[in-house]
Protein backbone atom coordinates (compact mmCIF):
# COMPACT_ATOMS: atom_id res chain seq x y z
CA UNK A 1 0.00 0.00 0.00
CA UNK A 2 1.35 3.41 -0.81
CA UNK A 3 0.67 6.86 -2.13
CA UNK A 4 0.80 7.01 -5.91
CA UNK A 5 2.57 9.53 -8.13
CA UNK A 6 1.41 11.51 -11.14
CA UNK A 7 2.76 11.75 -14.69
CA UNK A 8 2.45 13.52 -18.09
CA UNK A 9 3.54 14.63 -21.67
CA UNK A 10 3.39 17.56 -24.09
CA UNK A 11 0.77 16.63 -26.73
CA UNK A 12 3.06 17.68 -29.56
CA UNK A 13 5.76 15.28 -28.42
CA UNK A 14 4.07 12.11 -29.60
CA UNK A 15 1.00 12.43 -31.80
CA UNK A 16 -0.03 8.80 -31.33
CA UNK A 17 -1.01 9.59 -27.74
CA UNK A 18 -3.62 12.18 -28.64
CA UNK A 19 -6.54 9.80 -28.31
CA UNK A 20 -7.84 8.96 -24.87
CA UNK A 21 -7.65 5.38 -23.66
CA UNK A 22 -10.91 3.76 -24.63
CA UNK A 23 -12.89 3.28 -27.78
CA UNK A 24 -10.57 5.49 -29.86
CA UNK A 25 -7.37 3.79 -28.70
CA UNK A 26 -5.52 0.98 -30.36
CA UNK A 27 -5.53 -2.22 -28.35
CA UNK A 28 -1.97 -2.34 -27.07
CA UNK A 29 -2.25 -6.05 -26.30
CA UNK A 30 -2.87 -6.72 -29.97
CA UNK A 31 -0.44 -4.14 -31.32
CA UNK A 32 3.04 -5.53 -31.82
CA UNK A 33 5.84 -3.25 -30.68
CA UNK A 34 8.38 -5.79 -31.82
CA UNK A 35 8.47 -8.98 -33.82
CA UNK A 36 8.56 -10.87 -30.54
CA UNK A 37 4.84 -10.43 -30.05
CA UNK A 38 3.43 -11.83 -33.27
CA UNK A 39 2.18 -14.97 -31.56
CA UNK A 40 1.50 -13.77 -28.05
CA UNK A 41 -2.04 -12.36 -27.95
CA UNK A 42 -2.82 -14.34 -24.83
CA UNK A 43 -5.78 -12.37 -23.61
CA UNK A 44 -7.46 -11.69 -26.94
CA UNK A 45 -10.19 -14.34 -26.82
CA UNK A 46 -11.31 -14.18 -23.22
CA UNK A 47 -14.95 -14.86 -22.45
CA UNK A 48 -16.84 -11.94 -20.95
CA UNK A 49 -19.51 -12.86 -18.46
CA UNK A 50 -22.89 -11.26 -18.56
CA UNK A 51 -24.49 -10.59 -15.21
CA UNK A 52 -27.38 -8.98 -13.43
CA UNK A 53 -26.42 -5.31 -13.18
CA UNK A 54 -26.19 -3.77 -9.75
CA UNK A 55 -27.97 -0.53 -8.98
CA UNK A 56 -25.43 2.30 -9.08
CA UNK A 57 -24.86 4.39 -6.00
CA UNK A 58 -25.59 8.09 -5.99
CA UNK A 59 -22.67 10.32 -6.98
CA UNK A 60 -20.34 11.17 -4.14
CA UNK A 61 -19.89 14.82 -3.30
CA UNK A 62 -17.30 16.43 -1.04
CA UNK A 63 -18.90 14.78 2.03
CA UNK A 64 -20.00 11.25 2.84
CA UNK A 65 -23.59 10.33 1.98
CA UNK A 66 -25.24 7.19 3.23
CA UNK A 67 -25.91 4.42 0.75
CA UNK A 68 -29.49 3.30 0.24
CA UNK A 69 -30.15 -0.31 1.30
CA UNK A 70 -30.44 -1.49 -2.30
CA UNK A 71 -27.12 0.16 -3.15
CA UNK A 72 -25.16 -1.84 -0.58
CA UNK A 73 -23.43 -4.68 -2.46
CA UNK A 74 -24.64 -8.23 -2.02
CA UNK A 75 -22.61 -11.39 -2.44
CA UNK A 76 -25.06 -12.71 -5.00
CA UNK A 77 -24.25 -9.82 -7.34
CA UNK A 78 -21.13 -11.83 -8.21
CA UNK A 79 -20.47 -15.30 -9.63
CA UNK A 80 -19.83 -18.00 -7.08
CA UNK A 81 -16.22 -18.23 -8.32
CA UNK A 82 -15.56 -14.51 -7.73
CA UNK A 83 -13.08 -14.34 -4.86
CA UNK A 84 -13.21 -12.04 -1.86
CA UNK A 85 -10.18 -11.89 0.37
CA UNK A 86 -7.64 -9.70 2.15
CA UNK A 87 -3.97 -8.81 1.70
CA UNK A 88 -0.88 -8.16 3.82
CA UNK A 89 2.89 -8.06 3.37
CA UNK A 90 5.66 -9.74 5.32
CA UNK A 91 7.54 -6.78 6.80
CA UNK A 92 4.34 -5.00 7.77
CA UNK A 93 2.90 -7.80 9.92
CA UNK A 94 5.35 -10.62 10.70
CA UNK A 95 7.74 -9.14 13.24
CA UNK A 96 10.40 -11.62 14.44
CA UNK A 97 12.87 -9.54 12.48
CA UNK A 98 15.95 -11.45 13.68
CA UNK A 99 14.49 -14.75 14.88
CA UNK A 100 15.11 -18.29 13.64
CA UNK A 101 17.91 -17.36 11.28
CA UNK A 102 16.25 -14.49 9.43
CA UNK A 103 18.62 -11.94 7.93
CA UNK A 104 18.01 -8.17 7.96
CA UNK A 105 16.03 -6.57 5.14
CA UNK A 106 16.44 -3.08 3.74
CA UNK A 107 13.46 -2.04 5.87
CA UNK A 108 15.06 -3.42 9.04
CA UNK A 109 18.17 -1.40 8.23
CA UNK A 110 16.23 1.73 7.26
CA UNK A 111 14.09 1.82 10.41
CA UNK A 112 17.00 1.04 12.73
CA UNK A 113 19.45 3.45 11.11
CA UNK A 114 17.10 6.34 10.34
CA UNK A 115 14.29 6.17 12.95
CA UNK A 116 13.54 9.85 12.38
CA UNK A 117 12.31 8.93 8.89
CA UNK A 118 9.33 7.10 10.41
CA UNK A 119 6.59 9.44 11.61
CA UNK A 120 6.24 7.79 15.03
CA UNK A 121 9.83 6.47 15.15
CA UNK A 122 8.64 2.85 15.21
CA UNK A 123 9.67 -0.18 13.17
CA UNK A 124 8.57 -3.65 12.12
CA UNK A 125 10.61 -5.56 14.70
CA UNK A 126 7.41 -6.94 16.24
CA UNK A 127 4.71 -5.44 14.00
CA UNK A 128 1.52 -7.50 14.46
CA UNK A 129 3.63 -10.50 15.51
CA UNK A 130 2.11 -12.64 12.77
CA UNK A 131 5.20 -14.84 12.71
CA UNK A 132 3.94 -16.24 16.01
CA UNK A 133 0.23 -15.42 15.68
CA UNK A 134 -0.43 -16.49 12.09
CA UNK A 135 -3.15 -18.89 13.24
CA UNK A 136 -5.05 -15.90 14.64
CA UNK A 137 -4.84 -14.26 11.21
CA UNK A 138 -6.21 -17.39 9.57
CA UNK A 139 -9.01 -17.51 12.13
CA UNK A 140 -9.93 -13.89 11.36
CA UNK A 141 -10.09 -14.69 7.66
CA UNK A 142 -12.31 -17.67 8.33
CA UNK A 143 -14.54 -15.68 10.67
CA UNK A 144 -15.09 -13.17 7.85
CA UNK A 145 -15.80 -15.89 5.31
CA UNK A 146 -12.87 -14.79 3.14
CA UNK A 147 -11.80 -17.25 0.47
CA UNK A 148 -8.37 -15.80 -0.35
CA UNK A 149 -5.39 -14.56 1.63
CA UNK A 150 -2.71 -12.69 -0.28
CA UNK A 151 0.56 -12.44 1.64
CA UNK A 152 4.22 -12.00 0.76
CA UNK A 153 7.39 -13.98 1.40
CA UNK A 154 10.19 -12.25 3.30
CA UNK A 155 13.21 -12.83 1.06
CA UNK A 156 15.71 -12.58 3.93
CA UNK A 157 13.69 -15.01 6.06
CA UNK A 158 14.31 -17.87 3.64
CA UNK A 159 17.60 -16.60 2.14
CA UNK A 160 19.25 -14.58 4.94
CA UNK A 161 22.11 -13.46 2.69
CA UNK A 162 19.84 -12.92 -0.30
CA UNK A 163 21.34 -15.90 -2.10
CA UNK A 164 23.05 -19.17 -1.28
CA UNK A 165 22.00 -21.24 1.73
CA UNK A 166 18.29 -21.63 2.44
CA UNK A 167 17.03 -21.03 5.98
CA UNK A 168 14.82 -24.04 6.71
CA UNK A 169 13.09 -22.30 9.62
CA UNK A 170 11.78 -19.71 7.19
CA UNK A 171 10.51 -22.40 4.84
CA UNK A 172 8.83 -24.11 7.79
CA UNK A 173 7.02 -20.92 8.79
CA UNK A 174 5.48 -20.36 5.38
CA UNK A 175 4.61 -24.04 5.06
CA UNK A 176 2.70 -23.85 8.33
CA UNK A 177 0.87 -20.72 7.19
CA UNK A 178 -0.02 -22.18 3.79
CA UNK A 179 -1.18 -25.46 5.31
CA UNK A 180 -3.31 -23.65 7.87
CA UNK A 181 -4.98 -21.63 5.13
CA UNK A 182 -5.74 -24.70 3.05
CA UNK A 183 -7.06 -26.58 6.09
CA UNK A 184 -9.53 -23.72 6.55
CA UNK A 185 -10.60 -23.62 2.88
CA UNK A 186 -8.73 -20.37 2.19
CA UNK A 187 -6.72 -20.11 -1.02
CA UNK A 188 -3.18 -18.69 -0.71
CA UNK A 189 -2.16 -16.03 -3.24
CA UNK A 190 1.55 -15.33 -2.80
CA UNK A 191 3.50 -12.16 -3.55
CA UNK A 192 7.14 -13.13 -3.94
CA UNK A 193 8.54 -9.64 -3.23
CA UNK A 194 6.87 -6.75 -1.41
CA UNK A 195 9.62 -4.13 -0.97
CA UNK A 196 11.80 -5.96 1.62
CA UNK A 197 15.03 -6.72 -0.23
CA UNK A 198 17.79 -8.45 1.80
CA UNK A 199 20.15 -5.84 3.22
CA UNK A 200 23.02 -8.16 2.32
CA UNK A 201 22.37 -7.54 -1.38
CA UNK A 202 22.05 -3.81 -0.80
CA UNK A 203 25.44 -3.81 0.91
CA UNK A 204 27.03 -6.15 -1.61
CA UNK A 205 26.14 -4.40 -4.86
CA UNK A 206 23.40 -1.80 -4.36
CA UNK A 207 20.29 -3.95 -4.57
CA UNK A 208 17.98 -3.17 -7.47
CA UNK A 209 20.38 -0.60 -8.88
CA UNK A 210 22.61 -3.47 -10.01
CA UNK A 211 21.71 -5.99 -12.69
CA UNK A 212 23.17 -8.75 -10.53
CA UNK A 213 19.92 -8.76 -8.57
CA UNK A 214 18.10 -10.28 -11.54
CA UNK A 215 19.79 -13.66 -11.06
CA UNK A 216 19.54 -13.49 -7.28
CA UNK A 217 15.82 -12.74 -7.46
CA UNK A 218 15.41 -15.65 -9.87
CA UNK A 219 17.04 -17.96 -7.30
CA UNK A 220 14.75 -16.59 -4.59
CA UNK A 221 11.69 -17.16 -6.77
CA UNK A 222 12.81 -20.71 -7.52
CA UNK A 223 13.11 -21.47 -3.81
CA UNK A 224 9.51 -20.28 -3.43
CA UNK A 225 8.24 -22.29 -6.42
CA UNK A 226 10.07 -25.43 -5.31
CA UNK A 227 8.94 -25.35 -1.68
CA UNK A 228 5.41 -23.96 -1.96
CA UNK A 229 4.30 -24.52 -5.55
CA UNK A 230 2.58 -27.83 -4.83
CA UNK A 231 -0.04 -25.85 -2.88
CA UNK A 232 0.30 -22.27 -4.11
CA UNK A 233 -1.22 -21.91 -7.57
CA UNK A 234 -1.36 -18.12 -7.88
CA UNK A 235 1.76 -15.94 -7.77
CA UNK A 236 2.63 -12.27 -8.09
CA UNK A 237 6.31 -11.63 -8.78
CA UNK A 238 6.40 -8.02 -7.56
CA UNK A 239 4.08 -5.71 -5.68
CA UNK A 240 3.76 -2.02 -6.60
CA UNK A 241 7.09 -1.57 -8.39
CA UNK A 242 6.06 1.96 -9.45
CA UNK A 243 5.64 3.21 -5.89
CA UNK A 244 8.76 1.38 -4.77
CA UNK A 245 10.93 3.02 -7.41
CA UNK A 246 9.49 6.51 -6.85
CA UNK A 247 9.63 6.43 -3.06
CA UNK A 248 12.85 4.46 -2.61
CA UNK A 249 15.01 6.07 -5.30
CA UNK A 250 13.18 9.28 -6.23
CA UNK A 251 11.92 10.96 -3.07
CA UNK A 252 13.89 8.64 -0.80
CA UNK A 253 11.16 8.35 1.83
CA UNK A 254 11.21 4.53 1.76
CA UNK A 255 14.07 2.07 2.11
CA UNK A 256 16.81 2.24 0.97
CA UNK A 257 16.06 5.97 1.13
CA UNK A 258 18.04 7.34 -1.81
CA UNK A 259 17.60 10.71 -3.52
CA UNK A 260 19.68 13.33 -5.32
CA UNK A 261 22.21 15.45 -3.39
CA UNK A 262 20.62 18.51 -1.82
CA UNK A 263 17.25 16.82 -1.31
CA UNK A 264 15.85 15.77 2.06
CA UNK A 265 16.17 12.01 2.41
CA UNK A 266 18.16 9.46 4.38
CA UNK A 267 20.80 8.89 1.69
CA UNK A 268 21.15 11.98 -0.55
CA UNK A 269 23.78 10.34 -2.73
CA UNK A 270 21.60 9.08 -5.56
CA UNK A 271 20.03 10.43 -8.74
CA UNK A 272 16.28 11.01 -8.49
CA UNK A 273 15.99 11.44 -12.26
CA UNK A 274 17.79 8.22 -13.21
CA UNK A 275 17.86 5.65 -10.40
CA UNK A 276 14.08 5.03 -10.30
CA UNK A 277 14.21 3.93 -13.93
CA UNK A 278 17.30 1.78 -13.39
CA UNK A 279 15.70 -0.04 -10.46
CA UNK A 280 12.44 -0.43 -12.34
CA UNK A 281 14.24 -1.87 -15.36
CA UNK A 282 15.91 -4.52 -13.22
CA UNK A 283 12.58 -5.37 -11.58
CA UNK A 284 11.08 -6.02 -15.01
CA UNK A 285 14.04 -8.15 -16.07
CA UNK A 286 13.80 -10.14 -12.83
CA UNK A 287 10.08 -10.63 -13.40
CA UNK A 288 10.72 -11.94 -16.91
CA UNK A 289 13.38 -14.40 -15.74
CA UNK A 290 11.20 -15.70 -12.91
CA UNK A 291 8.19 -16.16 -15.19
CA UNK A 292 10.26 -18.03 -17.78
CA UNK A 293 11.61 -20.34 -15.07
CA UNK A 294 8.15 -20.85 -13.59
CA UNK A 295 6.57 -21.84 -16.91
CA UNK A 296 9.44 -24.09 -17.94
CA UNK A 297 9.94 -25.98 -14.68
CA UNK A 298 7.17 -25.38 -12.16
CA UNK A 299 3.90 -25.29 -14.08
CA UNK A 300 4.09 -28.42 -16.18
CA UNK A 301 0.44 -29.24 -15.53
CA UNK A 302 -0.70 -25.74 -16.45
CA UNK A 303 -2.77 -25.37 -13.29
CA UNK A 304 -0.90 -22.35 -11.86
CA UNK A 305 -0.91 -18.64 -12.75
CA UNK A 306 1.68 -15.90 -12.38
CA UNK A 307 1.59 -12.14 -12.81
CA UNK A 308 2.41 -8.80 -11.19
CA UNK A 309 0.52 -6.44 -8.86
CA UNK A 310 0.49 -2.80 -10.03
CA UNK A 311 -0.29 0.30 -7.99
CA UNK A 312 -2.80 2.44 -9.86
CA UNK A 313 -4.33 5.86 -9.39
CA UNK A 314 -7.36 7.06 -11.28
CA UNK A 315 -7.14 10.37 -13.13
CA UNK A 316 -9.58 12.96 -14.43
CA UNK A 317 -8.59 16.01 -16.52
CA UNK A 318 -8.20 19.09 -14.33
CA UNK A 319 -10.49 20.94 -16.69
CA UNK A 320 -12.23 20.18 -19.96
CA UNK A 321 -9.34 20.95 -22.27
CA UNK A 322 -7.18 19.13 -24.77
CA UNK A 323 -4.01 19.73 -22.76
CA UNK A 324 -5.42 18.38 -19.50
CA UNK A 325 -6.98 15.47 -21.35
CA UNK A 326 -3.52 14.60 -22.63
CA UNK A 327 -2.04 15.19 -19.17
CA UNK A 328 -4.43 12.54 -17.91
CA UNK A 329 -3.16 10.10 -20.52
CA UNK A 330 0.43 10.74 -19.58
CA UNK A 331 -0.35 10.40 -15.89
CA UNK A 332 -1.80 6.95 -16.55
CA UNK A 333 1.24 6.05 -18.65
CA UNK A 334 3.68 7.00 -15.90
CA UNK A 335 1.59 5.54 -13.09
CA UNK A 336 0.32 2.29 -14.61
CA UNK A 337 1.90 1.93 -18.04
CA UNK A 338 5.49 2.16 -16.79
CA UNK A 339 5.35 -1.47 -15.62
CA UNK A 340 2.20 -2.70 -17.35
CA UNK A 341 3.14 -2.05 -20.97
CA UNK A 342 6.47 -3.93 -20.81
CA UNK A 343 4.69 -7.08 -19.58
CA UNK A 344 1.98 -6.62 -22.21
CA UNK A 345 3.88 -5.65 -25.36
CA UNK A 346 7.55 -5.70 -24.36
CA UNK A 347 8.41 -2.01 -24.01
CA UNK A 348 7.71 1.16 -22.05
CA UNK A 349 4.91 3.57 -23.02
CA UNK A 350 5.69 5.77 -26.00
CA UNK A 351 5.26 8.90 -23.88
CA UNK A 352 7.99 7.77 -21.49
CA UNK A 353 10.36 6.97 -24.34
CA UNK A 354 9.70 10.45 -25.78
CA UNK A 355 10.23 12.46 -22.61
CA UNK A 356 12.80 10.54 -20.57
CA UNK A 357 15.26 9.87 -23.36
CA UNK A 358 18.46 8.02 -22.53
CA UNK A 359 17.68 7.97 -18.81
CA UNK A 360 15.15 5.21 -19.57
CA UNK A 361 17.02 1.93 -20.22
CA UNK A 362 16.36 -0.07 -23.37
CA UNK A 363 15.39 -3.72 -23.65
CA UNK A 364 17.13 -6.11 -25.99
CA UNK A 365 15.03 -8.07 -28.46
CA UNK A 366 15.42 -11.19 -26.32
CA UNK A 367 14.30 -9.31 -23.20
CA UNK A 368 11.27 -7.97 -25.05
CA UNK A 369 10.32 -11.48 -26.10
CA UNK A 370 10.47 -12.68 -22.50
CA UNK A 371 8.50 -9.71 -21.19
CA UNK A 372 5.69 -9.56 -23.74
CA UNK A 373 2.60 -11.45 -22.57
CA UNK A 374 4.38 -12.56 -19.38
CA UNK A 375 1.38 -12.21 -17.04
CA UNK A 376 -1.38 -14.80 -16.76
CA UNK A 377 -3.13 -12.63 -14.18
CA UNK A 378 -2.75 -9.03 -13.08
CA UNK A 379 -3.30 -7.34 -9.74
CA UNK A 380 -4.46 -3.73 -9.40
CA UNK A 381 -3.94 -1.90 -6.10
CA UNK A 382 -6.39 1.01 -6.09
CA UNK A 383 -7.00 3.58 -3.37
CA UNK A 384 -7.79 6.99 -4.82
CA UNK A 385 -7.78 9.35 -7.81
CA UNK A 386 -6.54 12.81 -8.76
CA UNK A 387 -7.12 15.55 -11.30
CA UNK A 388 -4.30 15.73 -13.81
CA UNK A 389 -3.13 19.21 -14.85
CA UNK A 390 -0.86 19.93 -17.80
CA UNK A 391 2.57 21.52 -17.26
CA UNK A 392 4.27 23.15 -20.23
CA UNK A 393 7.71 22.02 -21.29
CA UNK A 394 9.66 25.23 -20.83
CA UNK A 395 12.68 26.74 -19.12
CA UNK A 396 10.38 27.71 -16.23
CA UNK A 397 9.99 24.06 -15.18
CA UNK A 398 12.97 21.80 -14.57
CA UNK A 399 12.27 18.20 -13.47
CA UNK A 400 13.93 17.29 -10.18
CA UNK A 401 12.17 13.97 -9.53
CA UNK A 402 11.38 11.19 -11.96
CA UNK A 403 7.67 11.93 -11.43
CA UNK A 404 8.25 15.40 -12.90
CA UNK A 405 9.14 13.81 -16.23
CA UNK A 406 5.45 13.45 -17.08
CA UNK A 407 4.87 17.22 -17.10
CA UNK A 408 1.57 16.91 -15.24
CA UNK A 409 0.62 17.73 -11.68
CA UNK A 410 -1.76 15.68 -9.54
CA UNK A 411 -4.42 17.88 -7.96
CA UNK A 412 -6.95 16.96 -5.30
CA UNK A 413 -9.22 19.84 -6.37
CA UNK A 414 -10.58 20.41 -9.85
CA UNK A 415 -10.85 23.69 -11.72
CA UNK A 416 -14.15 24.36 -9.91
CA UNK A 417 -12.40 24.20 -6.53
CA UNK A 418 -14.14 20.99 -5.43
CA UNK A 419 -12.30 17.94 -4.11
CA UNK A 420 -12.34 14.89 -6.35
CA UNK A 421 -14.14 13.08 -3.54
CA UNK A 422 -14.58 13.00 0.24
CA UNK A 423 -11.37 12.93 2.24
CA UNK A 424 -11.01 9.78 4.33
CA UNK A 425 -9.06 9.15 7.51
CA UNK A 426 -5.76 9.26 5.61
CA UNK A 427 -4.58 12.56 4.20
CA UNK A 428 -3.90 11.24 0.69
CA UNK A 429 -6.96 9.06 0.08
CA UNK A 430 -10.00 10.80 -1.41
CA UNK A 431 -12.88 8.44 -2.06
CA UNK A 432 -13.55 8.18 -5.79
CA UNK A 433 -14.95 4.76 -6.78
CA UNK A 434 -15.51 5.86 -10.38
CA UNK A 435 -11.74 5.98 -10.77
CA UNK A 436 -11.58 2.23 -10.18
CA UNK A 437 -14.33 1.51 -12.69
CA UNK A 438 -12.61 3.70 -15.27
CA UNK A 439 -9.26 1.95 -14.80
CA UNK A 440 -10.83 -1.48 -15.16
CA UNK A 441 -12.44 -0.37 -18.41
CA UNK A 442 -9.09 0.95 -19.63
CA UNK A 443 -7.66 -2.51 -18.94
CA UNK A 444 -10.52 -3.97 -20.98
CA UNK A 445 -10.48 -1.57 -23.91
CA UNK A 446 -6.80 -0.71 -24.23
CA UNK A 447 -4.95 -3.71 -22.82
CA UNK A 448 -6.93 -6.70 -24.08
CA UNK A 449 -9.09 -7.41 -21.01
CA UNK A 450 -6.67 -9.55 -18.96
CA UNK A 451 -7.89 -11.44 -15.88
CA UNK A 452 -7.66 -8.94 -13.02
CA UNK A 453 -7.75 -9.14 -9.25
CA UNK A 454 -8.16 -6.03 -7.13
CA UNK A 455 -5.23 -6.98 -4.93
CA UNK A 456 -5.41 -3.95 -2.61
CA UNK A 457 -8.25 -1.55 -1.80
CA UNK A 458 -9.04 0.23 1.45
CA UNK A 459 -8.53 3.24 3.69
CA UNK A 460 -6.84 3.95 7.01
CA UNK A 461 -7.93 5.31 10.33
CA UNK A 462 -5.48 7.75 11.88
CA UNK A 463 -4.46 6.44 15.27
CA UNK A 464 -5.06 9.57 17.31
CA UNK A 465 -8.00 11.51 18.73
CA UNK A 466 -10.40 12.75 17.58
CA UNK A 467 -10.18 10.92 14.24
CA UNK A 468 -10.28 7.45 15.76
CA UNK A 469 -12.25 7.61 18.98
CA UNK A 470 -13.48 4.04 18.58
CA UNK A 471 -11.14 1.91 16.46
CA UNK A 472 -13.74 -0.83 15.99
CA UNK A 473 -16.47 1.45 14.64
CA UNK A 474 -14.86 1.95 11.22
CA UNK A 475 -17.95 3.15 9.35
CA UNK A 476 -15.90 5.17 6.85
CA UNK A 477 -13.95 2.06 5.83
CA UNK A 478 -17.17 0.11 5.48
CA UNK A 479 -18.73 2.80 3.29
CA UNK A 480 -15.56 3.05 1.20
CA UNK A 481 -15.36 -0.70 0.62
CA UNK A 482 -19.05 -1.03 -0.20
CA UNK A 483 -18.79 1.71 -2.83
CA UNK A 484 -15.66 0.24 -4.37
CA UNK A 485 -17.07 -3.28 -4.49
CA UNK A 486 -20.03 -1.75 -6.32
CA UNK A 487 -17.58 -0.01 -8.67
CA UNK A 488 -16.01 -3.38 -9.46
CA UNK A 489 -19.46 -4.77 -10.25
CA UNK A 490 -20.16 -1.82 -12.56
CA UNK A 491 -16.97 -2.63 -14.48
CA UNK A 492 -17.86 -6.32 -14.68
CA UNK A 493 -21.29 -5.43 -16.06
CA UNK A 494 -19.49 -3.50 -18.81
CA UNK A 495 -17.33 -6.47 -19.71
CA UNK A 496 -14.20 -6.12 -17.57
CA UNK A 497 -12.72 -9.49 -16.59
CA UNK A 498 -12.36 -9.00 -12.83
CA UNK A 499 -11.92 -12.19 -10.81
CA UNK A 500 -11.64 -11.01 -7.20
CA UNK A 501 -11.42 -8.21 -4.63
CA UNK A 502 -8.85 -8.34 -1.80
CA UNK A 503 -9.13 -5.69 0.90
CA UNK A 504 -6.04 -3.97 2.22
CA UNK A 505 -5.48 -4.96 4.78
CA UNK A 506 -6.42 -7.96 6.79
CA UNK A 507 -5.01 -6.50 10.00
CA UNK A 508 -3.60 -3.20 11.23
CA UNK A 509 0.07 -3.15 10.33
CA UNK A 510 3.28 -1.15 10.16
CA UNK A 511 2.48 1.37 7.43
CA UNK A 512 5.98 2.11 6.16
CA UNK A 513 7.03 5.75 6.74
CA UNK A 514 3.76 6.37 8.62
CA UNK A 515 4.61 3.73 11.22
CA UNK A 516 1.60 2.62 13.23
CA UNK A 517 -0.21 5.95 12.95
CA UNK A 518 -2.38 4.70 10.06
CA UNK A 519 -4.52 1.62 10.59
CA UNK A 520 -5.68 -0.07 7.36
CA UNK A 521 -6.93 -3.33 8.86
CA UNK A 522 -10.32 -4.97 8.84
CA UNK A 523 -9.07 -6.39 12.12
CA UNK A 524 -7.83 -4.17 14.95
CA UNK A 525 -4.47 -5.01 16.50
CA UNK A 526 -4.41 -4.09 20.17
CA UNK A 527 -0.72 -3.51 20.80
CA UNK A 528 -1.42 -2.89 24.48
CA UNK A 529 -2.90 -6.37 24.83
CA UNK A 530 -0.35 -8.67 23.20
CA UNK A 531 -1.37 -7.80 19.63
CA UNK A 532 -4.80 -9.28 20.22
CA UNK A 533 -7.00 -9.41 17.11
CA UNK A 534 -10.43 -7.74 17.27
CA UNK A 535 -12.89 -7.62 14.38
CA UNK A 536 -13.95 -4.14 13.31
CA UNK A 537 -17.41 -3.27 12.01
CA UNK A 538 -16.17 -3.71 8.43
CA UNK A 539 -14.94 -7.22 9.23
CA UNK A 540 -18.29 -8.15 10.75
CA UNK A 541 -20.02 -6.83 7.63
CA UNK A 542 -17.86 -9.10 5.47
CA UNK A 543 -18.80 -12.04 7.69
CA UNK A 544 -22.45 -11.33 6.92
CA UNK A 545 -21.76 -10.50 3.28
CA UNK A 546 -19.93 -13.79 2.70
CA UNK A 547 -22.43 -15.92 4.60
CA UNK A 548 -24.75 -16.47 1.61
CA UNK A 549 -24.94 -20.24 0.98
CA UNK A 550 -23.15 -21.34 -2.18
CA UNK A 551 -26.33 -22.90 -3.55
CA UNK A 552 -27.89 -19.44 -3.68
CA UNK A 553 -25.10 -17.84 -5.67
CA UNK A 554 -24.86 -17.45 -9.42
CA UNK A 555 -23.74 -20.32 -11.58
CA UNK A 556 -22.14 -20.13 -14.98
CA UNK A 557 -23.60 -22.08 -17.91
CA UNK A 558 -22.29 -21.87 -21.48
CA UNK A 559 -20.29 -18.72 -20.65
CA UNK A 560 -23.41 -16.77 -19.61
CA UNK A 561 -24.20 -15.99 -16.01
CA UNK A 562 -27.59 -17.16 -14.76
CA UNK A 563 -28.97 -15.91 -11.46
CA UNK A 564 -30.45 -18.86 -9.60
CA UNK A 565 -31.93 -16.80 -6.81
CA UNK A 566 -31.27 -13.66 -4.84
CA UNK A 567 -30.93 -12.97 -1.16
CA UNK A 568 -30.26 -9.87 0.90
CA UNK A 569 -27.60 -9.67 3.55
From Swiss-Prot:
Any one Pfam family match given in the protein's UniProt record, by short name: Glyco_hydro_1
Function: Acts in defense of young plant parts against pests via the production of hydroxamic acids from hydroxamic acid glucosides. Enzymatic activity is highly correlated with plant growth. The preferred substrate is DIMBOA-beta-D-glucoside.
Active site residues per record: 240, 456
E.C. number: 3.2.1.182, 3.2.1.21
Keywords for this protein: Chloroplast, Disulfide bond, Glycosidase, Hydrolase, Plastid, Transit peptide
Known tissue expression: Expressed in young seedlings early after germination.
pH influence on activity: Optimum pH is 5.5.
PROSITE patterns: GLYCOSYL_HYDROL_F1_1, GLYCOSYL_HYDROL_F1_2
Disulfides per UniProt: 259-265
Effect of residue 520 to Y: 43% loss of activity with DIBOA-Glc and 71% with DIMBOA-Glc
Effect on the protein upon substituting residue 247 to A: 99% loss of activity with DIBOA-Glc and DIMBOA-Glc
GO molecular function: beta-glucosidase activity; DIMBOA glucoside beta-D-glucosidase activity
Further comment: Wheat is a hexaploid with three different genomes that contains at least four genes coding for GLU1: GLU1A (AC Q1XIR9), GLU1B (AC Q1XH05), GLU1C (AC Q1XH04) and GLU1D (AC D5MTF8). The monomers can aggregate in diverse combinations, reflecting the several isozymes found in the native enzyme described in PubMed:10750901.
Protein's gene: GLU1A
Uppermost EC category: hydrolase
Official protein name in the record: 4-hydroxy-7-methoxy-3-oxo-3,4-dihydro-2H-1,4-benzoxazin-2-yl glucoside beta-D-glucosidase 1a, chloroplastic
Localisation per UniProt entry: Plastid, Chloroplast
Reactions catalysed, as given in the entry: Hydrolysis of terminal, non-reducing beta-D-glucosyl residues with release of beta-D-glucose; DIMBOA beta-D-glucoside + H2O = DIMBOA + D-glucose; DIBOA beta-D-glucoside + H2O = DIBOA + D-glucose
Quaternary structure, from the entry: Homo- and heterohexamers.
